Amino acid sequence: ASIQGKPADLRVSVIPTIHGEKAVLRFLNTDTVIDSPETFGMSEENYGKVLDILKRPNGIFYITGPTGSGKTTTLYMILERLAELPVNIVAIEDPVEKHIRGISQMQVNTQAGLTFETGLRAALRQDPDVIMVGETRDSQTLKTSVRAAVTGHLVLSTLHTNNAAGTVVRMLDMGAEPYLAASSLSGILAQRLVRKICPDCKTEREPDEEERKLLGPGIRRIRYGTGCARCGYTGYQGRTAVHEVLAVDKTIRAMIAGGCREEEIASYAENILGMRTLRDDLLRLVDQGITTAEELERLTFGEQRP
């Protein structure tokens, strides 16, 4: 398949309903290379943090977020960058959504006994430098990933959590020992997808009173789309990602091993390490006129930390 002349892989899901079959199509851009922050859809600061985490020789790097937050796309972008290096990369996926030259990709097949966990154990016998596990779905896969990380491998995987600090709690809830979670975790990239304002009908105005409370005093003008034929009169066209990057340091390792709460880890990351939260990153996009205050409200509703 192709989108606007660019190659793309197509994934189709069809289910039967009482009104007939319902189909959902997922397009994955196969022509994107992670060579700049713009390509990756993130700030220079967060991009630099991701590259620093990937330079570490071992540890687990999680990409987290809800379903449909672009985790797979980000994971493939990272793999493509790593594939340019002289390293042995093995990936276990379900399904393989994009073929990447230079990477040994395995397709999960539960009927044949190939699961994420068994594939991961098999990959460890292939002398890998980097292992990608498409999704950490169960405690056994998590524990094997932890063992791989502490024995000198860089492990990339995804988890369903709301923010970076919440990933630590998720690991412990899935059965990881605190001291092993502390020693194995290298970094976390939490992300969401937000809609971009249509460039053809973009306009601006001053925020109203409610929007000022949401945005804070730093943003004096906001942009939005009035709606046009090109965007289907929605005011939006395309999507981009917002990110939250947590690079694990010695203090965070000690906090994890000591059983600190999610809020304490988040507070340290934000106030001491200067981590920009998902909300902070989205405020940046609102200020730049890339997305709207409406998207900020949608993202932060019910997710603000105390």
Residue ranges, per PLM feature:
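Short, flexible helix-loop junctions that flank or precede catalytic/ligand sites
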Residues: 1-306
